[in-house]
Regions:
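Helix-terminus/linker motif at the lipid-water interface of multi-pass membrane proteins
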Residues: 25-40, 110-114, 173-175
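Helix-terminus/helix-capping segments at the ends of transmembrane helices and short amphipathic helices
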Residues: 32, 68-73, 110, 146
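Small-residue-rich midsections of specific transmembrane alpha-helices
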Residues: 23, 27, 44-72, 91-94, ...
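Interfacial/gating helices of multi-pass transporter permease domains
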Residues: 31-55, 179-184
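Transmembrane helical elements of multi-pass membrane transporters/channels
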Residues: 8-28, 40, 161, 185-189
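Hydrophobic transmembrane helix module of multi-pass membrane transport proteins
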Residues: 2, 47, 90-189
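N-terminal membrane topogenesis motif
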Residues: 1-24, 78-85, 121
């Protein structure tokens, strides 16, 4: 049964990975054709800054998955429930730390971005920050699927979300070439 689940997880993860790459490429092409190139640079900078802040997780996910294996194998639902409550608190704390650290970085954004003509750049960053930080408030649940060898369920949900987001972003860029709308969609989907 474990081999069957593992192969199913690999198959769905591979499909999801290639789908994500293709969708990101299409969205990036539409992005470059619809908005000034400066927005692409800002988008990349914010992505890198927030990836650095996401290091706050520091390997919590593998520890969660490892601690769930035994109670799931023995069907100890009380232990699973209590561990999930603990992980929920940990992930909410991590999300709050990321948001707080990100807010503390706002005064130094001008140091990273010189001579820009883009108005509202700090608001753009704040929306990116919320998108990253708030994702931790519910992402702890994924670890239960991984520990239960049902990663394919997560892959399906992520793929559907990626498709919806990509289609909405492409439509938004083509109809209303607005960076505001582009990043707000990231927060909503």
């Amino acid at each position: 049964m474990r081999i069957k689940q593992a192969s199913k997880n690999i198959k769905y993860a591979t499909i999801a990975y290639f789908l994500k790459i293709i969708l990101q490429l299409v969205v990036r092409l539409v992005f470059v054709k619809s908005l000034p190139v400066e927005y692409l640079g800002i988008n990349g900078l914010f992505t890198n800054l927030l990836a650095m802040l996401s290091l706050a997780e520091l390997g919590v996910a593998p520890a969660i998955v490892y601690s769930l294996y035994q109670p799931l194998a023995t069907q100890d639902s009380a232990t699973v429930k209590s561990l999930m409550q603990l992980f929920k608190k940990a992930y909410i704390s991590i999300g709050c730390i990321i948001i707080t650290a990100g807010i503390c970085m706002i005064p130094w954004l001008d140091w990273f971005i010189k001579e820009n003509d883009i108005t509202g750049i700090k608001w753009f960053y704040f929306i990116f920050l919320l998108n990253t930080g708030l994702s931790y408030f519910y992402s702890y649940k994924r670890n239960l699927l991984i520990a239960d060898q049902k990663q394919y369920v997560n892959s399906i949900y992520q793929s559907v979300g990626q498709i919806v987001l990509s289609v909405l972003q492409i439509l938004a860029l083509l109809v209303f070439p607005s960076y505001w709308l582009y990043i707000i969609l990231m927060l909503l989907v």
